[in-house]
Amino acid sequence: MTTVETAVGTTQSMVLNMGPQHPSTHGVLRVLLELEGENVIRAVPDIGYLHTGIEKSCEDKTYSQAITLTDRMDYLNPLGNNLVYCLAVEKLLGLEVPKRAQYIRVMLVELQRISSHLVWLGTHALDMGAMSLMLYCFREREEILKIFERFAGQRMMTSYIRIGGLALEPPAGWREHVKRFLDMMPPRIDEYEALLTKNPIWQGRLKGVGYISAEDLIALGTTGPGLRAAGVAFDNRKAFPYSSYEEFAFNVPTRTESDCYARYLVRVAEMRESVKIARQAMEKISDEGLIKTEAPGIIPPEREKMKTEMEALIYHFKIFTEGFSPPPGEAFVAVESPRGELGCFIASDGSPKPLRVHFRSPSFINLQALPKMVEGQLIADTVACIGTIDIVLGEVDR
């Protein structure tokens, strides 16, 4: 069964539609399941219900205008989307971002990673019947969103990371707010693990379920926690450091079991590592310094300069009305999102609008592993497998 059209049952089997409105698909994913009794013999994911045309829309905007579209792709990782897009444009322009801005970027995207994993853990636990975790995880996520609101004035679609640096200077009192959260988070993760990790019901639902070999994952191009749960310690922050990640000390959590339980353990361990990275970044951020590089005609000037310098006023007007024109060429950058390798390819023809924008979205590629995970499993285990892949349909369809 390779297409939706060929997913028809025989007299011995039944075809069941799971989704696109099923709550456990976490969006509008439709999965056609061919069943023999309660056993899944074939599965076909059917995507496209949330197609928004973000890539094509980016090609109709100037380079700066397209940033706001990237927020809405993986809506649980908007800062990560901003980052990969801005890094690609900066590579195209040959811009060097100030260290202070790089450290702030790292701190915020690691908080975003924790926030994304909290949504995953809460919703996955709810799918498995553990309602309390949903409430606890969203309690902690709320604190992260308050930090984002303090920095950017917006809780989710922040557009805070900009080409050449950041949109705004960090607000007064941010350091105490972030430190308070980072001090609070490790005991809360201990609390989650006390409820789940050794719980026999939780283990019974996840252990040995959804196994897929490392060879199959590599062949499919899968990345992220799913690949690391199969024993492959690949993480773009270590393999191809960006935004000064080479200056940070952290581990890449791995397991070897490659089942749903291993994927759960890897993500929980990743939250602990993100707390470490965010704390190191916070300590590296100085109270004074540049938050964006100085590049007249590309980076908007400071508002104070616009009051006294005519050139700054002209640059500001031209950047926001006409945009800037990178030299013709191509750039590709990959970062480590909460779901795996998130890449951005941009082709420039020398005009103020990109010729082509393409995102390598990890959710889209990781979803290919679902049939191999669920075939031969019980239908109830399909819910567990979808949960541990951790897909975001806005990124799958984009």
Q: What are these model-derived regions, one by one?
A:
Residues M1-R398:
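Metal/cofactor-centered catalytic core regions of large enzymes
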